């Protein structure tokens, strides 16, 4: 049971860093630190000259030259965006240590059950990979004329974090069940779980692209978009480019694919209800809140804290989906036995 509690704590930290990552993106803070220093980067600049040096590095980015600079950014404003990127990176280091040190302790004491060492190592590899992927994302906006990081790399960074979150939750649930039933075997992923997960994956991918392309600003009305229902996509470069780059089309797809996700999640919630009523309620509550916050984000013209709450609820939706999928997978195994 101690291992399960530990993984729940790490999962809570991942939810927190997802929210902080949302703030970092929405405040345009991601390119404020233009280098990656694993050790020396732990501390922020401690003198005015050090702050000025960091600001000078940021002023070389396309974001500053084309957006922040013309908007009149000064050193005080730079310190604000620097804080969020620095905090995001620090929290990433905390997550790494919060996973590695207890894992080593449990490993040395022989407390990790058979069959789980490889899974825990895979989760730790995902955590390390997140750090590398985060820098790979930032690097896409450094030394170029881009005013934002690549939305493809941004989506990979977010989706990997949420995959890690689901893995932590799933493993914690397996370990909790094992502590209660010594001969329990890991839950399996069922067909309905695959269906709901794939549809939710597409919705989160679209949401990440919307965030990365600032496509939330394409329309501030709902359900219509700027007076119309269907978008008029930019097809000058073909449909593939439009489906991956056109802000208006991606905004449209994100807001309406959400209803496909709702249907899939309702099916999942109904399937799990006989086995775990709380998981069913969690799924319904999470997607209901997600939809309301998504609409509120649009109508508020992408208010920072509403948009952050929308992303935070997305992480909670991933947790509730993993919980429901695990409950169904556990019940199916029990029935088969």
UniProtKB/Swiss-Prot annotation:
State the EC number(s).
1.17.99.9
**GO BP term, pick one:** heme A biosynthetic process
Annotated PANTHER family: CYTOCHROME C OXIDASE ASSEMBLY PROTEIN COX15, CYTOCHROME C OXIDASE ASSEMBLY PROTEIN COX15 HOMOLOG
Query: Which cofactors are reported in the record for this sequence?
Result: heme b
| Pathway in which this enzyme or protein is active | Porphyrin-containing compound metabolism; heme A biosynthesis; heme A from heme O: step 1/1
Q: Where are the transmembrane segments?
A: 3-23, 94-114, 120-140, 154-174, 191-211, 248-268, 289-309, 311-331
Annotated compartments = Cell membrane
**Function as written in the Swiss-Prot or TrEMBL entry:** Catalyzes the conversion of heme O to heme A by two successive hydroxylations of the methyl group at C8. The first hydroxylation forms heme I, the second hydroxylation results in an unstable dihydroxymethyl group, which spontaneously dehydrates, resulting in the formyl group of heme A.
Keyword terms, alphabetized: Cell membrane, Heme biosynthesis, Iron, Membrane, Metal-binding, Oxidoreductase, Transmembrane, Transmembrane helix
CC annotations in GO: plasma membrane
What is the name of this protein?
Heme A synthase
* Subunit field text: Interacts with CtaB.
What family classification does the UniProt entry report for this protein? Belongs to the COX15/CtaA family. Type 2 subfamily.
Enzyme class, top EC level, equals oxidoreductase
Note whether Transmembrane helix occurs among the keywords: yes
UniProt cross-references to InterPro entries, sorted A to Z: COX15/CtaA_fam (IPR003780), HemeA_Synthase_type2 (IPR023754)
Primary location class? membrane
Instruction: Enumerate the GO terms in the molecular function aspect.
Output: metal ion binding; oxidoreductase activity, acting on NAD(P)H, heme protein as acceptor
- Key word Magnesium present in the record? no
Where does the source fall among the domains of life? Bacteria
Q: Which reaction does it catalyse?
A: Fe(II)-heme o + 2 A + H2O = Fe(II)-heme a + 2 AH2
